[in-house]
Amino acid sequence: IRTSNGSLGYVKEDNLGKINTIRDDMVETSKVEGKVSLAWEYFSDYGSAPERSGAMDGVNVVSPTFFRLEQLGKGNVKENVGTAGINYINWAHNNGLKVWAMISNESMLDTTSEIMNDYKLRNKLINNIVNLVVKYNLDGINIDFENMYMEDKAMFNRFLIELEPRLNEMGKVLTVDVTAPDGSETWSMCFDRNTISKVADYIIFMAYDQYGASSNKEGTTAGCDWVEANITKFLGQEGVNPDKLVLAVPFYTRLWKEANGKVSSETVDLKD
């Protein structure tokens, strides 16, 4: 049983009455057959979803950046779908693509921490996510919560554990973005990758940046050796199921400059 504040407990079997088991109707899942080939579609303004026509070669899932947490919003979610976003969803479905919309925490440490540590706020956020999935006929949700307190690791797990069955009962997919295993407390050590991989349908390794914009030395964005070493850690010390691991690669690089003993960089995107 679960109390009103989210704590779990039990009741002795002797104190239970007659138990009736009800078999739910099977719900068709929104998972993809075979390997996941996903493309994030980034846009920030309301109703600014890109117009698309025809299929995307090699892609079977799109993840538009539709949702983000409100700062100090107590579990509320901002959306930027609009008519353009609805047309985008219809285009994707008409071309056989799954839509796993992304929700971001905008790297807001304190806002995220407040929600994760409050059962009522977590439940409010979960209800908002579920309502948006239904409202826009989405096939799943991609959780992109970055820059979190390491101390909130267990409560982030709790959030996912509470969200997953709500999506699963509708046949919807839960995916979670995570960083490389080795790094800072708020960037890397805030994720329990083993538990996340058990709860979510897919865990997405954001294989970037090996050397980011704030680095004090120049280097590659995602070197092959670095990526392979981290995949080995995911499958080894982190205990992630390989069937659930999705590798996200950067379609950008950095041009580095050095002047007066200091380095700076410029981001260069991959062009069509």
Which functions belong to the PLM regions below?
Residues 3-36:
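Boundary regions of SH3-family modules and the immediately adjacent low-complexity/disordered segments
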Residues 37-41, 59-64, 99-103, 141-143, ...:
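Hydrophobic faces of well-ordered beta-strands that scaffold small-molecule active sites
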Residues 40-44, 67, 104-106, 146-148, ...:
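Active-site beta-loop-alpha junctions enriched in small/polar residues
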Residues 45-57, 85-94, 130, 189-198, ...:
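Short amphipathic alpha-helices and their capping/turn segments at secondary-structure boundaries
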Residues 45-72, 128-141:
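Catalytic domains of carbohydrate-active enzymes, especially glycoside hydrolases
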Residues 63, 68, 72-82, 89:
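N-terminal catalytic cores of secreted or lumenal carbohydrate-active enzymes
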Residues 72-81, 127, 150-271:
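Substrate-binding surface in catalytic domains of secreted glycosidases
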Residues 81-141, 145-146:
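Substrate-binding cleft of extracellular glycoside hydrolase catalytic domains
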